[in-house]
């Protein structure tokens, strides 16, 4: 009789959890919540913004992120944003003025014509493998139609990766 009571209690507990609307926190990992105040009430709205907490700065990591979200990860800032924070390229001080950030999102002109051109296509670049000090030669260059190339010799040669 005691065993039947324990089993019944366990089923009741499981049913209560299942029907209470309990959803693990992880289910909302890619849909952050924002709080919006209205006149006398506060409401919670789901937003489609995705914010990355980790630093993503490898060729494959950034390429995969670009394909999935159609933008650079949050650890990237443009040269003008970095300058506004006090970055001076000749000082190699990006890690000091913007810890955890890398330069990315600026237009790449493709002046030498080493990348394929097409009507309306624009190119942008992103530093890869940056940790601190002066920027290295590794860059990811991506187009407005999502062609993605890498260069490890500061634009001398390119290899398509996506």
Swiss-Prot record:
Active site as annotated: 125, 154
Main location: secreted
Enzyme class: hydrolase
Enzyme nomenclature, EC number: 3.1.27.-
Record has Signal as a keyword: yes
Single annotated GO MF: RNA binding
Domain of life: Bacteria
UniProt-listed InterPro entries: Barnase, N1-like, Ribonuclease/ribotoxin
Task of the protein: This is a purine-specific ribonuclease.
The protein's name: Ribonuclease
Organism: Bacillus intermedius
